[in-house]
């Protein structure tokens, strides 16, 4: 059986350079149908590996800047706020909190230009990270790569922060990790802020190994976009959710919000403000030898990181979390 490649035609020959580059890059990078290949599984793995290579050649700034993303962000509306400028001569790990149900704020702020990231932080190329399994799905994989999204695997993070950039070693690059992950989504209740963070220190060790400064990010309103069934009131549901998490790496919160033509039941998020505040960077001293990274230094940076999150909360809670029913809480 012969192998067929389906390439995108150059239909934008009269358009902007960015438009044509985006199409030709996707064509050259293997926008193919795996089922028509002699070795579909091998091809699928090789295409998925592009998400961990640290190579941003599939990133399409034209797609990231489409007007549809501005419409998407204005639905809530979502806004991005900067505590202070970031130097393009450093590299960064942005830690996004909370996860919420779907992390709408993380997508709007760091996977698109709808909120003006490039204007707020000129010279910094930020890559939003997600589960590696998302890059094993044909078509969706190409879409994610074009949006500048990459795998959250350790290999991917290290490659992104140690290759390319201004100096060929990651200068001017950043990654955004939703630190709380699937576990935190189960605590995504309106008007609360419960962060799964006490034991999450892998990203701190990654920062030390790569020499990337830590940048805490707090999204006010992320947990307010959906209502969720409280799993602690339903032990069977909670056990099932945790089983799915351990098996598949993600969980399935039971949630609802509004519909297209009603405000009571549906899967569309509520129209509630999203204010994403980027905190002050925490300087990290690089230690290339992973085995020699000191636990005391990891704990010290983790403590500074939590303190910066708490500072953001205290500074902005009366403006962006007026309807809160509790204060910020950091749990294991």
Segments and roles (model prediction):
Residues 318-332:
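C-terminal helix/juxtamembrane-tail motif
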Residues 58-62, 196, 291-298:
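Amphipathic alpha-helical protein-protein interaction segments
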Residues 274-277, 294-313:
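Pol beta-like nucleotidyltransferase catalytic core
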Residues 288, 296, 321-325:
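Charged, glycine-interspersed solvent-exposed loop segments at helix/strand-loop junctions
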Residues 1-81, 88:
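N-terminal low-complexity, Ser/Thr- and acidic-residue-enriched intrinsically disordered segments
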